[in-house]
Amino acid sequence: MHKDKPTLNLDALRDSVAFSVRLSQAAIDAIDVGTTLDPAGDAALAAARGYVAGGARNNALRRAAMDAYRAAQRVGAGPAFHALHSVSAAAGAAFLHPPGGSTDAHQTKHILGAAVQYVLCIEASGGDSAAAFGSVMTCIPDAIKELLRMYPEPVAGKQRYGAVLVMLYRSIT
């Protein structure tokens, strides 16, 4: 759970983005073969990968995340919607705030957002959400577990996204 004065470093941010990129790619791979992902999704995934490889946490990365988010909104629903949101979350994971602020519970979305969207993508594809959840659980590096323990449990809210977010958080921490 929330520790006294934990710190957040660049390695933790890069680990979080790398984890998110992995799940975003899995979401993209899960959508129908005939489905073409909006170019904004490809750009956001490339930007996130660039960050993991040592690139800057800058406005271009933030814009790529927002462009993928807007592309998802244009799609509206279905597997491609969730795949685009997963990619947006991967690029946005670089903007995690250090623990200790008033938005701490919200920050878990930066860490687990791509994972949540991966599970929702599998569900929207008619796949087994329990298997998708299991896939997420088997690929979580220790660094992400440690990072999550710095933040309080998120609020589930009324949507499926929030329920999956809380289930993942509880299972990991």
Task: Cite the ranges covered by each PLM segment.
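Structured binding/interaction patches within domain cores
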Residues: 1-137
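Acidic, carboxylate-rich catalytic segments that either coordinate divalent cations
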Residues: 143-173
